[in-house]
Amino acid sequence: LKAERVESGFHVERASFTVSLPSKLKGKYDMAIANFGVPLYGATLVGSFKYPKTDQDGCAEFDANAFNTNSSYGANIMLLNRGECPFTTKAFFAQKAGAEAVIIVDNIAEDLITMDAADDAESQEYVKNISVPVALITESVGEKFEEELSAGNAVIATLNWTDVLPHPDSRVEYEIWTELTDSCGAKCDAQVGFLNDWAPIAKELETKNYTQFTPHYLTWSCPEGYEDSDVCLSECINHGRYCIPDPDDDLYSGYSGADVVVSNLRALCAFKAANDSQIPTKWWDYITEFQSSCKMSTGLFNSYDCAETSMKRAGLDTSSWKNCIGDIDANSENAMMEEQIIAQSPPSESTRSSVRILPTVVINDVQYRGKLARGEVLKAICAGFPNDLRPEMCSDSGLINDKCAQGADGWNTCLSDPDKSGETTCSTTSAFPYYECICPKGLHSEFSDSLNTWSCVSVQQTARSVGKTSTVLASVFFSLLVLVTCLFLFYRWKMKQVMNQEIRGILSQYMPLDDDEMEEEEDTARLNAGNDSSSIRLGRSGSPTAMFG
């Protein structure tokens, strides 16, 4: 029997803010970091609170006079009431109206809670576009600020994320908790996209010994006595020990929860194989290959052969991998899955928080809150280093900021102008390498064989080039047409000569022909050949003497 243990529970990740004005509200307050938006890890933000005159729940677009965004007190920090619509809707409309941070006031007398985004497509679309920090404060604290702001008084505060993440040493340890399902809509698409986007950064950080990464997957156990139920048989492996909810909510068709557990287990064992090989970054090669080749939509998600092929392409040993996976039908524990249960639900004496939200990033044992995106997660990881030990990637010229900034990779590649045309420009993108070289208005990309690269050419130049090319092509076409016509006429003349010789040879077998008669017969043959392509009539009486098919 398993021993009962007390879990540490879910921790609300907090930051703080300090009010400097008015004096009666002066002090330090806690705020709960939302699981979306962009917390400014390692930084502070000074500004003034704004409270809209109407639509104080922020569930619709604000009109131009809702609040004054022109402030001499720094950033615009929007204060909104909880309720009536999702948190993501409030944050998006506030940001659109000019807010540089959003604070939502709870409408229930309770402790701080973590705000999360819903799984529906609209909420996930908002999540992708929210680029400001979002947090929640308690009802009692928020009412004080709303009262002061409604009276027309200013409230000046400094939001602080500098001490959110600990930085105990020169190496940051982080975990990524995801799920391998790829058919749950926008949320799954975002997770798959993030892992592919993050892979090159993770490999570089790990190779240079800046970080130590560990992948994790959530699991749950079937309640005792229900191991043989339809639910547990479909969603669990190892006799109900490790389960995941059915990905399509259909126990009797499609992929099962057990399929997902097995895929997660294979990924965990791939990570073990990568560590055993002394090249842990090979796990990223496995997971990106698996996500690309073994999709649910292609019917290969639960294919052992597909997963094994991904292992081989990543250069990992498959024999130890098979042993690690073990017998999923056995009524026994699996060491890799037991590690997941302990990590997601630490004992009460642990300082770690239980993992309950997917996806979750844990940095130095503290759960990251915010948008699951390359730049935002990198900023948080960089905040986990001591200031004097941060890798170059965390600097202004690193991946953390604009890749088209002067001195960055994009600038060096695009604006350094390898073709000396002075026309190439750089644009940032959301996917690795996070920039692309594009052409300004009036120009288009054209490949240079001599430079083996793309460069920008004006549309007018292209038009002239196209015009010249068209003229040359027209001349060539006309010449070919004349040549074909001449060849056709020569062919017809030659065929007539051959036909005349054959006619003369045949007629000579029946009657002697002098030259005049032969010419007459030839004229008759030519005339009749023109009237009937399938036969030639000969003889003075008009009776058929020969027929040619």
Language-model segments: residues:
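Conserved N-terminal segment of EGF-like repeats
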Residues: 384-548
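Typically the conserved alpha-helix immediately C-terminal to a functionally engaged Cys/Sec
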Residues: 184-207
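Loop/turn elements at helix/coil->beta-strand transitions in domains of secreted/extracellular proteins
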Residues: 73-77, 97-101, 170-174, 207-213, ...
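Extracellular/luminal ectodomains of secreted and membrane glycoproteins with large N-terminal domains
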Residues: 50, 78, 85, 91, ...
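Disulfide-rich extracellular modules and peptides
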Residues: 61, 186, 190, 224, ...
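Cysteine-centric redox/oxidoreductase cores and disulfide-bonded domains
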Residues: 220-405, 468-470, 481-484, 492, ...
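Structured lumen-facing ectodomains of secretory-pathway proteins
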Residues: 2-188, 217
